[in-house]
């Protein structure tokens, strides 16, 4: 799967970069295109190299044990323990035990899996690094960004250099995984399919940018990072912000919000699973809106992006209604807080809903009962962020 994905991406990159801008001297355009082609080729080579490295380590372990397939660690929601802990916790026997388990599950490439119990037993030789066949390591569902933050806090609390070393390896994976255009795939090394899209879904871009922002500032639990690491993180963050601005969707001449995924080359909103359409998304975009408002001295472009996204939320909010997961219709409730559909149709801003058969509907009641019960089609999470926006807007009024 990976080889096909990488080859396709490389071909698209080369094809896209053969076009020149008439306003740009041909020599400049050609040089830029050639450099971008080299950048993408190097990126894909890094992905292949790290994938081979991860596979080789596990293969060597299995061979030494006389096994042909790895055992699996215990699955769990998130990581099996409360990750919001005070610094003193990392000095306790329980904190040290869990952090040792986290160290054991770090892949040779530097990342971690999702839905893997990291509060139970440490990873054993010949055991997979996560519960899934693919997507190891990943940035999905807070994986890798969560472990990196925990390691920084553990090092701050204990001074154990193992935590710092593992932190640095994880940080390097984030830097290596960043696309030349500034975005991140869901998993790296690349695994193909929609997982290779630039991913806003489940706050993935947000989570990685928060880590980089913290490293770049070098304060609190990140005060141990070197000046070089801070500068590198800042440069990576700036590339990510450029990608965020470039992927903010323009609809009918107006800046709106973002998709859950964007194509890694065209930067347009892209489809993921059958019921996750190429669309504007309220749930994922609000995380990015929130992050942009944390930046000191935001540029005019970022200020405009925030105001535009907030205006879109105001224009698309649903009032006087509630929805209970699984129900086929909305319920009238006059004093209900505003809510939003998860997905909005590109170009029309109409709420849309998908199903496992790739069908798209304008009413949640048209979706199968299984998907109505198994997916969050509406959200009111933007309300809290929009309250913060009201204060932010006074400090940074729209030009």
Pin down the residues of each PLM region.
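Gram-negative bacterial Sec-dependent N-terminal signal peptides
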Residues: 2-20
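Terminal, non-catalytic domain-edge segments
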Residues: 23-94, 214-239, 265-272, 276, ...
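N-terminal carbohydrate-binding/catalytic regions of secreted carbohydrate-active enzymes
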Residues: 83-145, 150
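A cross-kingdom feature marking solvent-exposed beta-strand/loop segments within repeated
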Residues: 114-139, 176, 180-200, 265-277
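Eukaryote-skewed repeat-based solenoidal scaffolds used as protein-protein interaction platforms
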Residues: 164, 168-171, 175, 192-248, ...
